[in-house]
């Protein structure tokens, strides 16, 4: 059905839907826009809608808003104009017909409830669909947009009206007045009306269905942005106390400690007080202002990637569990800030009990932190209360965040995962909840980590300083230029899908009352944890600092001319761009020269100038600290570095022999650095890397052999140096195993560390993780898994010597002699 233009123009004029540039509506909107421009400072989600959502501005675009609000419409208009999107107040002209560029799904409430305007959305949808019927080349992009002023979820008690209600004019005025600077314009992926018309038709029932689906979309979107209501804290405690698991634990506590039931119950309440968050939207708003100021002053930018996939999961009703790597105490604040600005609910965060000091503890608690002790051993009541609290968060639909590494990485590499909280997450699923739980791995990276100096001291044996107010103030006083931050969301892991694939009968273990530990739980949790670490590394972010540190630390003198550094960075960048580590990893778009200029602004390097040019130097006192940043991306370059080391040593080598060498060493590298490839994927990866190294001129390919190219030998040697220290560590352990096949695990780890420390001193190895206990412990476990150490604990001497000989070829002769002489007690 179509309307003549005069009738339509009259209808649009009476509803105020006419062009912004004509008649009294122009005056009306200008007058309304004046206070809004002062009161409202909205943010767009996503930050750049057109490219991030794939909008084609050369094709018609119409906007769909949830309900009639001129304030929302003008707020949308401001964001559209700021991002070069069509003005929603300019009508669309299609085949001589003028149509509004925006549609309100619902007329919205009024101050005077007896006045209910006729809804126009169905009629307008039908008009648009009808035009697609008559014009087969037409394809209008329908973009759902919601404008939110404030995102308080409200409390379960004490509110007559639900927090997601539509506002009438007076309510909207006060919302804009109070929350105008806490407003978001959320653009959703577009819907093709051409596809709708082709697949479903163009009659009025389809228009009605479109309006109904749009209503559901906006309701889900607001719930994803605001979250479920918050409980009164005491009501939550009462519910937990009434649970069968805690009631039984209280009885056991009273019996084992020979105390009264009331005293045991008080102990349980005290633990709840210690653990539970006290979420406050007003604290979120205040902290958002402070953090916004902090990021703008000290950081040069926060780079966020792949957030749309998380927004979609939240929109689809998934229970989100954020699992980031842990670099710094700043992670807590940065991730909550990023999620809030991506239109998502800040999560409840599992924080170490060491952060529960005044004033940080109460502040973190109001920002959603719940506190967890380092160990649950020996305290059944505590473990039960914590598990029930975590399960209650899941059952109520709150997003949760925890650091699967258990603590901050002191080396810049991922730590082996701690699986306790992850195990409780799966146990929560076994209560039979209806919402699917999805784990979101997250890579967090920085160009400057405030605690990196402290980490280096701790790795050298210093006692960890207890977190306190003075320590926090000292840290804040050192804030300077922190460069850029990176938050990359990795590939989500839907737990239900994972369990269906790997434990098909997992539903048989569901118990809505008791926490269960089926036989499959521990191995499954371990596999999930390892997979999560791989997915975190898959989302790695290369940046100016970690690339420059990688190159300078590869140089034995920790210095390169600017030309050499530029050439080396180009090598790294081309490898990462042309043979990406994964589809989720990110590489700077800037040139090598621009990255060097940026890194020099961080004041970590020195520059000496002479008549020939600049020499960029990494000072000795900074070298140990800079290994942290190199290690952030070690996994992204270790395979090409290993290939370069093998080719450099042999001068020329066939692809098959190269593949054999890599295949021997890869299991250790995969376990240590959580690499993404399985063994059967290596041939294709090595071929791709070899072709890229040939393209760069680092090697030549002749008759299926890789030959070193003397013209670029320095670049190849610096690339090879990225694997140097790792290969030296492996050589230490394999030599010790070969020399003493019956050595026990503890002694092997201890002696490996002793030799590594000796090597570090004698050969100027600056990396603290070179003799880190955890690294050698992980290596020895991998050797057992790979069969180098038998079930009885003895090594297989023939196999270990074979691997040592391979490694001995890849390390320098002086390092090899130091390793071999150390076991003989020689100097």
Swiss-Prot record:
Its EC number is 2.3.1.15. A motif (HXXXXD motif) lies at residues 326-331. The keyword Cell inner membrane applies. It is an enzyme of class 2 (transferase). It comes from the Bacteria. GO terms for cellular component: plasma membrane. Its main location: membrane. Pathway: Phospholipid metabolism; CDP-diacylglycerol biosynthesis; CDP-diacylglycerol from sn-glycerol 3-phosphate: step 1/3. One of its GO terms (molecular function) is glycerol-3-phosphate O-acyltransferase activity. Signal peptide: none annotated. GO terms for biological process: CDP-diacylglycerol biosynthetic process; fatty acid metabolic process. Keywords: Acyltransferase, Cell inner membrane, Cell membrane, Lipid biosynthesis, Lipid metabolism, Membrane, Phospholipid biosynthesis, Phospholipid metabolism, Transferase. The keyword tRNA-binding does not apply. The HXXXXD motif is essential for acyltransferase activity and may constitute the binding site for the phosphate moiety of the glycerol-3-phosphate. NCBIfam families: plsB, PRK04974.1. PANTHER family: DIHYDROXYACETONE PHOSPHATE ACYLTRANSFERASE (PTHR12563:SF17), GLYCEROL-3-PHOSPHATE ACYLTRANSFERASE (PTHR12563). HAMAP family: Glyc3P_acyltrans. This is Glycerol-3-phosphate acyltransferase. It comes from Shigella flexneri. The lineage of its organism: Bacteria, Pseudomonadati, Pseudomonadota, Gammaproteobacteria, Enterobacterales. The gene is plsB.
């Amino acid at each position: 059905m179509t309307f003549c233009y005069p009738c339509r123009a009259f209808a649009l004029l009476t509803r105020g839907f006419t062009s912004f540039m004509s008649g009294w509506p122009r005056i009306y909107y200008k007058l309304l826009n004046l206070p809004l421009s002062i009161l409202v400072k909205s943010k767009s989600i996503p930050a750049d809608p057109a490219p991030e959502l794939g909008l084609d501005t050369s094709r018609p675009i119409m906007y769909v808003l949830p309900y009639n609000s001129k304030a929302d419409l003008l707020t949308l208009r401001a964001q559209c104009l700021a991002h070069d999107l069509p003005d929603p107040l300019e009508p669309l002209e299609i085949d001589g017909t003028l149509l509004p560029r925006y549609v309100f799904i619902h007329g919205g409430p009024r101050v005077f409830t007896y006045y209910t305007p006729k809804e126009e959305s169905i009629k307008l949808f039908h008009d648009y669909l009808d035009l697609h019927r008559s014009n087969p080349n037409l394809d209008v992009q329908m973009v759902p947009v919601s404008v939110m002023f404030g995102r308080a979820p409200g409390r379960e008690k004490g509110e007559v009206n639900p927090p997601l209600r539509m506002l009438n004019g007076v309510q909207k005025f006060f919302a804009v007045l109070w929350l105008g600077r806490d407003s978001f314009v959320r653009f959703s992926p577009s819907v093709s009306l051409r596809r709708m018309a082709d697949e479903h038709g163009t009659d009025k029932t389809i228009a009605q269905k479109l309006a109904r689906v749009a209503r559901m979309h906006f309701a889900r979107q607001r719930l994803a942005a605001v979250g479920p209501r918050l409980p009164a804290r005491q009501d939550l405690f009462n519910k937990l106390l009434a649970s069968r698991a805690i009631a039984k634990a209280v009885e056991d506590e009273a019996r084992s400690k020979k105390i009264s039931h009331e005293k045991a119950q008080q102990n349980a309440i005290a633990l709840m007080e210690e653990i539970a968050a006290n979420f406050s939207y007003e604290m979120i708003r205040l902290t958002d202002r402070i953090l916004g100021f902090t990021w703008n002053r000290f950081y040069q930018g926060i780079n966020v990637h792949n957030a749309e996939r998380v927004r979609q999961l939240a929109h689809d009703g998934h229970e989100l569990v954020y699992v980031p790597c842990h670099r710094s105490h700043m992670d807590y604040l940065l991730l909550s800030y990023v999620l809030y600005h991506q239109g998502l609910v800040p999560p409840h965060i599992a924080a170490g009990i060491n952060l529960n000091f005044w004033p940080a503890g109460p502040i973190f608690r109001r920002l959603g932190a719940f506190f967890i002790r380092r160990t649950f051993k020996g305290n059944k009541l505590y473990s039960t209360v914590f598990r029930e609290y975590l399960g209650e968060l899941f059952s109520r639909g709150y997003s949760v965040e925890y650091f699967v590494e258990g603590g901050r990485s002191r080396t810049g590499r991922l730590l082996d995962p701690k699986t306790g909280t992850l195990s409780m997450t799966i146990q929560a699923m076994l209560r039979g909840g209806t919402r699917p739980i999805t784990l979101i791995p997250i890579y967090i990276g920085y160009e400057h980590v405030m605690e990196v100096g402290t980490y280096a001291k701790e790795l050298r044996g210093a006692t960890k300083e207890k977190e306190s107010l003075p320590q926090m103030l000292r840290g804040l006083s050192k804030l300077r230029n922190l460069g850029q931050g990176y938050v990359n969301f990795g590939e989500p892991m839907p737990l239900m899908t994972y369990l269906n694939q790997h434990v098909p009968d997992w539903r048989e273990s569901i118990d809505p009352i008791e926490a269960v530990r089926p036989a499959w739980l521990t191995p499954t949790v371990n596999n999930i944890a390892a997979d999560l670490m791989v997915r975190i590394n898959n989302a790695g972010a290369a940046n100016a600092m970690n690339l420059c540190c990688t190159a300078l630390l590869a140089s034995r003198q920790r210095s390169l001319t600017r030309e050499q550094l530029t050439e080396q960075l180009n090598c790294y960048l081309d490898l990462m761009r042309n043979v990406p580590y994964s589809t989720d990893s990110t590489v700077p778009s800037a040139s090598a020269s621009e990255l060097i200029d940026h890194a020099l602004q961080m004041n970590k390097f020195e520059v000496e100038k002479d008549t020939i040019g600049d020499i960029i130097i990494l000072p000795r006192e900074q070298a140990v600290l800079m290994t942290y940043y190199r290690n952030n991306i070690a996994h992204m370059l270790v395979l090409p570095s290993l290939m370069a080391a093998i080719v450099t040593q042999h001068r020329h080598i066939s692809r098959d022999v190269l593949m054999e060498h890599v295949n021997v060493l890869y299991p250790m590298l995969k376990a240590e650095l959580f690499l993404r490839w399985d063994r059967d994927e290596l041939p294709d990866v090595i071929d791709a890397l070899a072709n890229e190294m040939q393209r760069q001129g680092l090697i030549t390919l002749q008759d299926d052999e890789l030959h070193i190219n003397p013209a670029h030998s320095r670049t190849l040697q610096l690339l090879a140096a990225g694997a140097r220290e790792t290969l030296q560590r492996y050589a230490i352990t394999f030599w010790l195993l070969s020399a003493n096949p019956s050595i026990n695990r503890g002694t092997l780890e201890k002696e490996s560390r002793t030799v590594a420390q000796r090597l570090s001193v004698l050969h100027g190895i600056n990396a603290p993780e070179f003799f880190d206990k955890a690294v050698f412990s992980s290596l020895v476990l991998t050797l057992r898994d790979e069969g180098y150490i038998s079930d009885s604990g003895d090594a297989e001497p023939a196999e270990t010597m074979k691997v040592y000989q391979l490694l001995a070829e890849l390390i320098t002769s002086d390092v090899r002699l130091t390793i071999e002489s150390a076991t003989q007690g020689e100097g």
